[in-house]
From Swiss-Prot:
Binds 2 manganese ions per subunit. It comes from Sclerotinia sclerotiorum (strain ATCC 18683 / 1980 / Ss-1). InterPro entries: Aminopep_P_N (IPR007865), Creatin/AminoP/Spt16_N (IPR029149), Creatinase/aminopeptidase-like (IPR036005), Pept_M24 (IPR000994), Peptidase_M24B_aminopep-P_CS (IPR001131), X-Pro_dipept-like (IPR052433). Mn(2+) 2 binds at residues 305, 316, 501. This is Probable Xaa-Pro aminopeptidase SS1G_06948.
Length: 556
């Protein structure tokens, strides 16, 4: 195959496409002016499909790579079956691949020529026979070109020869995310002439640069990506609202999960960004509780952490509410404290802010509140703060990036506070490791905690009463036990835990809250309106049943 001619042809087609579409600003199609007697010759131009901005994303990656030549090589997820089965799991595309294509079907590979600015998708050959009968036809190259922001679509059988050709004739390395994603069937070594001698050079593949460049690019959301996150957030909000409406007459955590997921599926959001967390009572103290199978009766609070995906983009929302529609004194105190933590931290968000500082402010607010409630005591605020006592009640990071992953990537990987957690550490070391953040100036290398315009992050403070954490770790440690009011804890264990979480877009001079799910008084109002409606429904049913009995008696 003549790849140079193919490249030249795709470049020409790319230039032609720039002038194909002229969308109207006043509707879904635009009309050319015609004489009223010439109506049969009316021409119109359909509104163009809004394509996923794959080329924009590829150019962003090029920018952060800092290279003017080379090739990016990214395989999508291959299709596969469960072990010892002929059934396939639900498909979930590799997110780095999706970021450069918007393509959400298996067995494809994308390449991007940095110096030619050419984005090519490599697809399996057309399927036929029983495969079509069972699974339908694969999209054709023509269909893909019409739908996606690509320069060319080619079939996979030509890929190996293309990569070999590229390695021998084009400048720069072939960049892969991971060594294991390097293609196996390519002539990896390049033979070059040095005078009369043939010298074998190094492999043309490089796995040291691409991941960090893509992480940095993915942290800054394009307008299209923000639109997807807003859509996911809107559907998620409706799921939370429907749970609130029915909460008073639900009996099990499983019903909460069912209502939320059904709401999302009915709105075409068929995938959850993560497993639904519907923890009631003390289950709310388990951060990633997902059993969702226990009764609600007799329990104070529900912590519902749930968010759907829309076209692979996540939302992440947590609401904590009283199951009865009314807070106990202890639950109200903890909810108010967490709400204060969140409100103050959100107000700190803006470009240039260090998320580490926001995170530590949450601990300061938490500690003051816990001291006022008498849950921690026996020292000054500064003494208790430097000891890290608040971590016993607030043991996780304040937030994370949101995007193609619910815990999305950014400069340096994930957001800075997540780097502190090593599940291999001994429990007694957790707090010491956590508070290294106060003194380790090097932990912010790579700028992962510095907020920038168009980042999306969560702010999700929480206060928890985990029996295991408190009784097996902190109360057994002389360093922390002296500060914790063990007797008062007994009153707060039934609260379980409170977490409140919103998704925030960093704007030019501050933030925008993308989360519209009700919280606080607005959530309570929905719960209690649901209770009133249920009570009216029961009264109506009883009245109808009474009338039926009266008619039956009269008839006989």
């Amino acid at each position: 195959m003549d790849f140079r001619s193919l490249i030249a042809s795709s470049v020409a087609q790319d230039k032609d496409r720039e002038f194909e579409v002229r969308p109207s600003s006043r509707g879904s199609w635009s009309c050319k002016e015609v004489d009223e007697f010439d109506a049969l010759s009316i021409e119109y131009e359909p509104k163009p499909i809004e394509k996923y901005p794959a080329k924009l994303h590829a150019r962003q990656v090029k920018k952060y790579l800092g290279l003017q030549e080379g090739l990016i090589y990214l395989p999508g997820l291959p299709s596969f079956n469960y072990e010892d089965s002929d059934m396939q799991p639900a498909f979930r595309q590799r997110r780095y691949f999706y970021y450069l294509t918007g393509v959400n079907f298996p067995d494809c590979i994308v390449t991007y020529s940095i110096h030619r600015d050419q984005l090519w998708l490599w697809i399996p050959p057309p399927n036929s026979g029983r495969s079509v009968i069972y699974n339908g036809s694969r999209p054709t190259a023509k269909e893909i070109m019409a739908k996606y922001d690509l320069d060319h679509v080619e079939t996979l059988p030509h890929l190996d020869s293309y990569l070999t050709w590229y390695a021998h004739t084009e400048p720069g390395k072939i960049h892969v995310l991971h060594d294991y994603q390097t293609p196996n069937n390519v002539e990896l070594q390049i033979t070059r002439k040095n005078g009369s001698q043939s010298i074998m050079s190094e492999s043309p593949f490089d796995s040291t640069k691409l991941e960090e460049a893509m992480n940095t690019a993915r942290a800054i959301k394009s307008p299209y990506e923000l639109k997807m996150i807003r859509k996911a957030s809107a559907i998620t909000a409706q799921g939370h609202i429907n749970v609130l409406r029915g909460l008073r007459y639900l009996s099990n955590e499983a019903e909460i999960e069912a209502i939320f997921t059904a709401t999302c599926i009915a709105r075409q959001a068929k995938t959850q960004a993560y497993g639904v967390i519907a923890g009631s009572g003390e289950n709310a103290s388990t951060l990633h509780y997902m059993a969702n199978n226990e009764p609600l009766k007799g329990r104070q609070l529900l912590c519902l952490d749930a968010g759907c995906e829309w076209d692979c983009y996540a939302s992440d929302v947590t609401r904590t509410v009283p199951i009865s529609g009314e807070y106990t004194e202890e639950a109200q105190a903890i909810y108010d404290l967490v709400a204060k933590m969140q409100d103050e931290c959100i107000e700190m968000l803006k470009p240039g802010a260090n998320y580490r500082d926001v995170h530590m402010h949450a601990h300061k607010v938490a500690l003051r509140g816990l001291m006022e409630l008498g849950l921690v005591e026996g020292g000054t605020f500064n003494e208790l703060y430097m000891a890290g006592v608040s971590v016993a009640f607030f043991p996780h990071g304040l937030g994370h990036y949101v995007g193609l992953e619910v815990h999305d990537v950014g400069p340096g990987g994930m957001i800075i506070t997540n780097r502190l957690f090593d599940f291999n550490r001994k429990p007694a070391d957790w707090t010491d490791a956590y508070f290294q953040i106060l003194s380790d100036s090097g932990i912010n290398s790579g700028g992962g905690a510095i907020l920038s315009k168009d980042m999306v992050v969560t702010v999700e403070p929480g206060i928890y009463f985990s029996r295991y954490a408190l009784e097996e770790v902190y109360l057994k440690s002389p360093k922390y036990a002296k500060y914790i009011n063990k007797e008062l804890l007994q009153k707060y264990y039934p609260v379980g835990g409170v977490r409140i979480e919103d998704d925030l877009l960093i704007t030019e001079d501050g933030y925008e809250n993308l989360t519209t799910a009700p919280k606080g008084e607005a959530a309570l109002k929905i719960i209690n309106e649901g209770r009133e409606q249920e009570e009216k429904r029961v009264v109506c049913e009883k009245a109808a049943e009474s009338k039926r009995k009266q008619k039956k008696t009269w008839f006989w």
